[in-house]
């Protein structure tokens, strides 16, 4: 048994036990039936505190701790959440040289992980692409115009049916920008919304529809899952998740499919302890 593994047992497992005993668990609501909740602490929390996506076999997560200038991309097995691999501080030099230090809500498409990246004095919002097998950056870095992303880019989601990538700013906006991943991230249009969205932490497509994880704090411990109708521009709340503790931060989300239907997985961040991966029936 290695020295580092012994340290992990000595320090992490007691922390995990304390967390499990003291942390209130999320509960089901009329619109969000909880299936399971798993807690990850310390080193694993560092690599999964922002975004989550999957390819059916693996979950891919992103982590950012700006206080210690740490970023990460990681891989876990779908079904068991067993750790597979991670890449600490994976951003390419062109990003780190200009101060990029934040990876947001990520999205998987066609063997690649698309990551929204921001940070630095001039924000420098961009999409960085990683190889899903190796977790290494592919060298593809697509800068986004500062006039469209003055406050950065917190999330992106790729429609697996078209290869189009969708993204918006963090603050209140009525526009979602659309890019073609198969054409050098060309900006091909916008989705104009009837009502503004804000504080979107992650998003994913399910059967051609875009769903988003929102972290507004105006409903106590309730965190909303939104649905966007591209044709009408309507934005609606399809699930109200009760994460019990109003100080927790809702982060990224993804869907998996099985014989029993689709399951929604959402990251909820307790910054004092770690990450909860909360899973719900996607009956919407």
Protein language model features and the residues they cover:
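Beta-strand-rich domains and repeat architectures in extracellular enzymes and scaffolds
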Residues: 41-71, 102
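Blade-loop segments of beta-propeller domains
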Residues: 81-110, 114
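Structural motif
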Residues: 68-75, 122-129, 173-179, 219-227, ...
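Surface loop/turn motifs at the tips and blade-to-blade linkers of beta-strand repeat domains
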Residues: 40-45, 88-90, 94-98, 142-150, ...
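Repeated scaffold domains used in trafficking and secretory/extracellular systems
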Residues: 46-53, 96-105, 147-158, 196-204, ...
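Beta-propeller domains
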Residues: 60-90
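Loop/turn-rich, solvent-exposed surfaces of beta-rich toroidal or solenoidal domains
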Residues: 195-230
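Short coil/turn segments that connect the beta-strands within blades of beta-propeller domains
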Residues: 56-57, 110-111, 161-163, 207-209, ...
